[in-house]
Amino acid sequence: AAGAPSLPAPPAALLRRSLVSLAALAPRTALAAGAMALAPGRPPPWLKYAMIPLVAGLLNWATNQLAVKMMFYPQRWLGLPRWTRVGWQGIVPAKATQMANDIVDDVIYRLINVSDVFQRLRPRDIAKGLPDAWYTDLGRLVADDIGYGWAARAPSTLGGAFNATVRIEGRALVASIVRAVQAEVEAAFDLRSIVVRGIASDTRVLVELFERCGEDDLRFVVNSGLWLGGALGVLQMGLWLVWNPWWALALTGAAVGFVTDQLAINAIFLPVERREIGPFCIHGLFLRRQDEVADDFAEFMQSRVLNAPAIWDELLTGSNSIRFWEIVDEQIRIALPRALGPGALLPVADELRPALLARIREELPKGVPHLYELTDDELDLRPLMRDEMRALPCAEFERVLHPVFEEDELTLILIGTALGGIAGAAQALSGI
């Protein structure tokens, strides 16, 4: 209500707000101090010591920024012209296939049961989703193949009856194919193949996935270099006051770089399980965002990887497509005697079967775009993946992002350690 006193912010929120304010103020303070240090004349003694935590903070911020960029960029190998083995490619693009397989093993298999998902498709809806013209064209092409094209095109009752029969029996055949695929979908559809191909074939997809799901956490790694590095730099300064051989600053600078990166990575993923200590909640920063990340991950996977075009392409041309077309052939063999009925046309079945299979293989890819919207609506994968991911135990959920840091953790720490040592040595030798 108007005029009501506002509730005090919780301690965790106040601490977070203070750290953000300090992080925003530090660069301007560092610039001012740097200007004083570089001004003509000998800088005052206190400034030499004050620069130690400022340099530590800024350097760790810069090295963490560099390390995060090195995770994802460049997306293709970039080497020296004459020394092609000397260069760099982002950790994620370089190991895209391995990481895509890890995502399948650690995440996708926990979210999606292929058999249950395909049961959501209604065979009659799929059969009706293909337009009448598709069935009519298919019937005429098959009739041409076996020498009965005149019947399909007859401008009489015969032609109308032929085409009507084709549409009725064609829909029955398509519905039976869908039911047969549902019965053994594990053999006809390879979930690993569609995910790995969708992610690893274009490294931009994998980079975008990790950047989107880990945006806040990657930003934390960068910004934590500033305030963690600055805080540890104060300890570094205190040590320098009582123990100041030139190499001590280099040694402590390297230690600050090492500890800063370790603390930042651990803060993202540890502790895995939520812990309450007084008014504070101790929980990995990434794990706190499980609901938010689940929504981002599900939306991304459904729109970019597990969408209807990719699903139909996997069925028709993927690694298990041989079994899919065997199912189609089996259903044609069952359907033809029923469609032709007893009589003169029954002996045509043996001739018609391979012709019909060949034409379906040719024409079905042209017809499935009419099924994309229906397929996405009936499978409805986004809420399924979102809800399943939200329900994952924390230890399983952290596998969504942790593999990126596991691959690059040593690189990030080595860069921070080496540059911290170099900066400390430069400070000591320059007298600033």
Please name every model-derived segment:
Residues 8-17, 38-214, 255-400:
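Large intracellular
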Residues 1-38:
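Universal eukaryotic N-terminal targeting presequences
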Residues 24, 89-93, 225-228:
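Alpha-helical transmembrane segments and their juxtamembrane interface "caps"
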